[in-house]
């Protein structure tokens, strides 16, 4: 195992820290739309202000002249950003310019900047490879939804950004990997080829000390369309599924009676110990964790109310900032759990989820068909949940009674466009198009295995039996048995050894259930194999359905299945 663990949060933090500590004196930090999000996910504003940063600016904003300040730019090397810098250098706003780009900058762009720098105010130009959004230490995203296939409307415009982000992550993690891809996917092969081209073009950047041969495995979301459709029951995944996490921020604006200061909350692993400790806890255990948190807060409240001496008052004042922070943490998580509870109850999600899990884990066809039909016929369930159950059924039983369920959805008033997603999903991720054993017979035993291996109780033993396809892929990597026919190497010279460091990147987006899968794998295999997971986006059900509806795919066999 490499001496230094792969940690995408630490990689970005290291870049930012190096930039701000190496440049002495008061400075203005200038960011673009993307790097503002990248930085905010690993540092708070107050932490950055402590590093002699006087002000934050967006590159697109008109800036006042501050000739006593240094301008420190952390931006993507886009043509738009290069042009903004060149325009500004004609009439400099700062006495010195320190330019840090999140990816490789072309010689043409360097020449443009040099030509524009007539007043000789550019002190340095550097490449610091922080061109991705670090979510968890072992999880990153590029925040690019709508990238399921080459037929997606956004593909042509954003595929270059995907290559940039993945290339940057390799350099940030200091890995020069061999590359494998999903054999049934043009998109993963295309991306593998583009990354290889970049690595060859910039081979000098990959002059790292070698300790084993890392692996970059590029996967396609279509190989597992089930995971993004399922309701989630662990904390981080539930929040994203029901409320949506956007760059560590969650809106509670729709929660009844919510206080103004809680309408948007921040969830940060570095600054919220409760969130960090409960990230992957299941719903059944979260209630106890919240109760413990509230009990701790009440104990502190009682202690603070017992102020009788000057010393007591002094201690209270010294501890007041920590007390305020603790109070905010309690309010935030109680509000989050309250809203999650409300939504689960409102939409009867536990009952829906139980049928979803049965569908995902290969139960008896007649029984599951009847369960799906019962929910479709019952007005207490949402139309969205009814549609998703039929989507899952259509993947699970392609030759089943899909047409009957489509007619049933139509009869209860679900619009034809939404019912059309059933054919779209099968055209995108039908059995003949998928790689890997998504619905293999071993899943029959997943319920028993999950109970025996993890000893889960209560809510989780019913609602978390499903394992993503990624679980089996990681198991194959660990045993050095990942099939070359399914996941070929791009180059002919490949390592036969089990990789110690693995970067898995999924075109079309990842889920927080898969992030949990990677976290669990890493926890069980410390010192043996370490995995980092990245994706074009982090999906929840709504985003996946939106991405699906924007693709121009139809199911060539949409009329089949009727008997």
UniProtKB/Swiss-Prot annotation:
Q: How does it sit in the membrane?
A: Peripheral membrane protein
Q: Lipid metabolism as a keyword? A: no
The chain's disulfide connectivity reads: none
- Primary localisation category: Golgi
Q: Which residues form the signal peptide?
A: none
Q: Which Pfam families match?
A: Sec1 (PF00995)
Q: Which InterPro entries does its entry note?
A: Sec-1-like_dom1, Sec-1-like_dom3a, Sec1-like, Sec1-like_dom2, Sec1-like_sf
Keywords of the record, alphabetical order, are: Endosome, Golgi apparatus, Membrane, Protein transport, Transport
Keyword Protein transport among UniProt keywords? yes
One GO BP: vesicle-mediated transport
Name a GO CC annotation attached to this entry. phagocytic vesicle
Q: What does this protein do?
A: May play a role in vesicle-mediated protein trafficking from the Golgi stack through the trans-Golgi network.
Q: What is this protein called?
A: Vacuolar protein sorting-associated protein 45
Gene behind this protein: vps45
């Amino acid at each position: 195992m490499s001496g230094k663990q792969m940690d995408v949060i630490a990689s970005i933090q290291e870049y930012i820290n190096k930039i701000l500590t190496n440049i002495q004196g008061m400075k203005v930090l200038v960011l673009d739309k993307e790097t503002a999000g990248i930085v905010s996910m690993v540092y708070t504003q107050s932490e950055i202000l402590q590093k002699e940063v006087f002000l934050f600016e967006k590159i697109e904003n008109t800036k006042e002249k501050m000739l006593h300040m240094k301008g420190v730019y952390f931006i993507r090397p886009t043509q738009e950003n290069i042009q903004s810098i060149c325009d500004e250098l004609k009439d400099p706003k700062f006495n010195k310019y320190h330019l840090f780009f999140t990816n490789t900058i072309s010689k043409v762009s360097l020449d443009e900047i040099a030509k524009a720098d007539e007043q000789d105010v550019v002190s340095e130009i550097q490449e610091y490879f922080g061109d991705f959004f670090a979510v968890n230490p072992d999880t990153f995203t590029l925040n690019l939804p709508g990238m399921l296939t080459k037929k997606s409307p956004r593909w042509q415009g954003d595929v270059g950004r995907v290559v940039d982000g993945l290339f940057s992550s390799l350099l940030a993690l200091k890995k020069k990997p061999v590359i494998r891809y999903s054999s049934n996917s043009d998109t993963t092969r295309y991306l593998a080829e583009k990354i290889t081209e970049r690595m060859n073009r910039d081979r000098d950047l990959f002059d790292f000390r070698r300790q084993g041969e890392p692996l970059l495995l590029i996967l396609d979301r279509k190989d597992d369309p089930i995971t993004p459709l399922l309701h989630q029951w662990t904390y981080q995944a539930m929040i994203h599924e029901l409320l949506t996490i956007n760059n560590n921020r969650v809106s509670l604006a729709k929660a009844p009676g919510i206080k103004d200061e809680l309408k948007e909350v921040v969830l940060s692993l570095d600054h919220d110990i409760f969130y960090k400790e409960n990230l992957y806890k299941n719903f059944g255990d979260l209630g106890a964790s919240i109760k413990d948190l509230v009990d701790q807060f009440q104990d502190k409240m009682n202690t603070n109310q017992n102020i009788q001496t000057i010393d007591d008052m002094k201690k209270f004042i010294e501890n007041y900032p920590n007390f305020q922070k603790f109070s905010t943490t309690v309010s935030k998580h109680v509000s989050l759990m309250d809203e999650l509870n409300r939504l689960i109850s409102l939409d009867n999600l536990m009952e829906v989820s139980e049928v979803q899990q049965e569908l995902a884990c290969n139960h008896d066809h007649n029984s599951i068909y009847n369960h799906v039909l019962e929910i479709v016929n019952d007005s207490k369930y949402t139309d969205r949940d009814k549609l998703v159950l039929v989507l899952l059924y259509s993947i699970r039983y392609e030759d089943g009674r899909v047409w009957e369920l489509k007619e049933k959805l139509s009869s209860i008033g679900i619009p034809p466009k939404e019912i059309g997603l059933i054919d779209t999903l099968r055209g995108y991720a039908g059995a003949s198009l998928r790689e890997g054993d998504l619905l293999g017979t071993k899943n029959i035993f997943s319920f028993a295995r999950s109970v025996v291996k993890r000893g889960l109780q209560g809510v989780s033993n019913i609602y978390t039996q499903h394992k993503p396809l990624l679980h089996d892929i990681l198991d194959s990597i660990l045993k050095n048995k990942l099939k070359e026919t399914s996941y070929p190497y791009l180059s002919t010279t490949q390592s036969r050894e089990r990789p110690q460091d693995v970067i898995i990147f999924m075109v079309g987006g990842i889920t927080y259930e898969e992030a949990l899968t990677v976290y669990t794998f890493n926890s069980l295999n410390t010192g043996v194999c370490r995995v980092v997971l990245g994706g074009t986006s982090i999906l929840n059900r709504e985003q996946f359905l939106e991405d699906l509806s924007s693709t121009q795919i139809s199911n060539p066999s949409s009329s089949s299945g009727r008997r």
